[in-house]
């Protein structure tokens, strides 16, 4: 009997140890103490757009900014004075529509805050370490095709709330005495280590508007690949000018078809009672009017579908097709894929030429979409809301999603600079423990204003 007891006790101890390792994430390389190795975080600067800022659920707010991937990297590396443009809750979004909050999962319903937060450390007498600006573009489109970038543009950033409807350039850069551009403010910090993730919006704006439809006109195109390559090379050169020994980690551009904004609404008509596709006389699911095989229907279609668009009159609709602006057809998808392929080739080339480390966000996001990720028993997928990785706007990660991103950066940093920086314990980051749970009652119910503001953030 004692032998049986000892066997059971040993088995329980082993099981406890296994579960402990699973729940804590991979903290350090086995047998090797935590170390920054040759990575020099003396002055750590993060450059990029909303993904760097920690933007999520259509707003920038402090309780999420503390989980931006640069802030998490800084914490894991022992950086004690990593400053960000923190905004009190409920935060600030685009327009009067602010942070999204989900009020029901079955059916999925959400609302938005109209209250606004305020910057909490606007008087910091130096530039912020996190210079990620939501809406930033590598190339600012202009008729003369001049190589102007949001990273180097020294025009009056204080005018951006009026000129572009974007308050974040003013919020992040604040004071021209600290530098008139992201580049100048970054240089003022004399960086030793930089993360650079830029270029997503150079193609995402085109995709999110169904192929460039803005105010009824098809006017937007992805940044030309040659322009992207040239400007990215100039950004790399500028970083080298700041510090010849600078250490840089760059990330490439994910496939837009991997994010819920383009994958949540199916191409076929759903029966609102069963949440299953309506089958036509040919025995196949009936597509929304205006949608063909292979097309991606964006979240912007939700309010139109609710009003009867895309639905034949016999099924209770208004018999009008979904407009092109809410559908990314197969030809437009080819344009997007071509741009992303060219951008990622340029990023890889510039990284190789300059000795920068590279995070392959493209492959990581496609893996998440195809197979998901199992972390401490929690399944993360690319599903809208319930997948756990994305926030309520369908474009940006959640806090736990950003923790996963931080760990992907840390993997590359550890390998490149012989470091052993502990990974972030993803499950210790706030998040809704939903796992993979499908919506049970039809399509999500999201106010049109919220989705429109998410798209506006991506436009020049």
Name each model feature, range by range.
Residues 19-23:
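C-terminal motif of bacterial Sec signal peptides marking the signal peptidase cleavage site
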Residues 25-460:
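Conserved active-site regions of diverse hydrolases
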Residues 1-11:
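Bacterial N-terminal signal peptides that target proteins for export
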